[in-house]
Amino acid sequence: MQLESLSTLNYRNLAPCTLSFPAGVTGVFGENGAGKTNLLEAAYLALTGLTDVTRLEQLVQSGEGEAYVRADLESGGSLSIQEVGLGRGRRQLKVDGVRVRAGDLPRGSAVWIRPEDSELVFGSPSGRRNFLDALLSRLSARYAQQLARYDRTVSQRNAALRSGEEWAMHVWDDALVKLGSDIMLFRRRALTRLSELAAEANEALGSRKPLVLGLSESTTPETYAHDLRSRRAEELARGSTATGPHRDDLTMTLGDFPATEYASRGEGRTIALALRRAELELLAERFGEKPVLLIDDFSAELDPTRRAFLLDLAASVPQAIVTGTEQAPGAALTLRAHAGRFTPEPEPVSAQVAVDEVGA
C-alpha cells in the first residue's frame, strides 16, 4: 500500500493543499500547533475512513460548513482514489467516485502511532477494549458485523431493562448469548497471535520483563446464559447489562504484575509501541502487504532506544510519514510545517548550518 498523494480542504487548521509522497520515509517537522498531527489525522481518515473524534464537526475548519480529504493510492499495481466528505455531522465516503461504507475501504491500509498511545496501558478498560475491537474489526469484516449487532442488541436490552420489561428479557438474552459468544471466541483466537507479536516487539525494545496479553472476561461462552439470568434483578435495578464482552478488558502482564497498575511510564510507552508494531504485523499478515505507517512526534518523551526503534520501524515499511519538532533522519522527503502549510525542505537544517558556518 502506498499513499501517492493527499488532498485536504477546510480540514482543521490545514490550508487547502495537495501533497505528494514518495516511497520510504517522509519527515514533517515544525513547531507544535503547526498542523503536523492534523496532517496525519487527515491521512488516516482518508486511508481508513476512521476517526476517533466524538463530533465530526470538530474536523471542519472554523467558519466552514464542510471539509474534504482525498487519498490517491497504489496497491498491488492498481490505482484508486478514496474521498471523505465531512459536513452537518455526516461522513460520506467514496472510492473511485462511488459511494461506499467505511467497511468497504481497505482495512489494512494504515497504522497510526501517537504519543497518547500510553493511555492503552494506563487508561480505562474501555480504551483497551476499543483498541482490540477496532483492530479485530479491520482483520475480519464478520467480526465488525457481529460487534455492531451485539452493540445494538445491548442498547435495545438496556432500554427494555429501564422500562422494566422483564417479560422480554429471554428474547434479548438469546440474541446476546449468540452474538457475544462469537465475539469472545474470536477475541481469544486473535489474541494468541497478537500476544506473540507484542511480546517479540517488547523484547526488541530492550525490555527484560516478558509481556503477555490476555482477556479479563466478565463471563464465558459456556456460562453467559446463566450469568445473564443470575444477574437479572441487579440489571433491572441499574437499567443496564452488567455482563458480556462489552465489559471485558485487554490485560497486559509485564513480568509477574499487571502493567496497568505497576508499569513505570517508560515501560508503559514501551508496551504501547509493542502493541502498535503488533498491530502493523497482524494487518500485514492478514492482507499481504504492510500498511502505510504514520508516526506522530517521533521523539516525544522517548529515550534513544525507543526513538531508534520507531525510526527503524519506519524504515522497515514501504512507506511512512513521520512528524516531529525536529527533522527525521534518513527521510526521502522532508516537509516543513508552518501555520497549516507544508513546504519541501531541500536539505537537513543541520547541513545548512554547517555550510553557513564554513562560509563564515
Swiss-Prot record:
Transmembrane segments: none annotated. Pfam families: SMC_N. It comes from the Bacteria. One of its GO terms (molecular function) is single-stranded DNA binding. GO terms for cellular component: cytoplasm. InterPro entries: DNA-binding_RecF (IPR001238), DNA-binding_RecF_CS (IPR018078), P-loop_NTPase (IPR027417), RecF/RecN/SMC_N (IPR003395), RecF_2 (IPR042174). CDD domains: ABC_RecF. The keyword Protein transport does not apply. ATP binds at residues 30-37. Keywords: ATP-binding, Cytoplasm, DNA damage, DNA repair, DNA replication, DNA-binding, Nucleotide-binding, SOS response. This is DNA replication and repair protein RecF. The lineage of its organism: Bacteria, Thermotogati, Deinococcota, Deinococci, Deinococcales. The gene is recF.
